[in-house]
Amino acid sequence: MAPENPAPASLDDCVAAIRYAVANAAEFGADGSRFAIGGDSAGGNLTAASVLRLRDENGPTARLQLLLYGAFTANNDLPSVIENGEGKILTRQAMIWFYNHY
């Protein structure tokens, strides 16, 4: 992930991994026509972005997305960001840094 590997490297990796897993599902004892993907924080963002890219490229369709507190906006001026931006594990300034390196 960023900053060492800027966007869209992480999205490209996720989509490639999904395509590989679906194409080789039988090898893993799974059904490639029935799969779910999910992630938390940046992983939630990558999950949603992967599903959208696969849709746009007529790729495999996930049956379920599990999006746990995904990072879906770079708007750091939202009331919830300002109200909860200090004293937590991820501060407002840290999130700005992450977004600037995405």
Predicted regions: what they are:
Residues 1-102:
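Alpha/beta-hydrolase superfamily serine-hydrolase fold, recognizing
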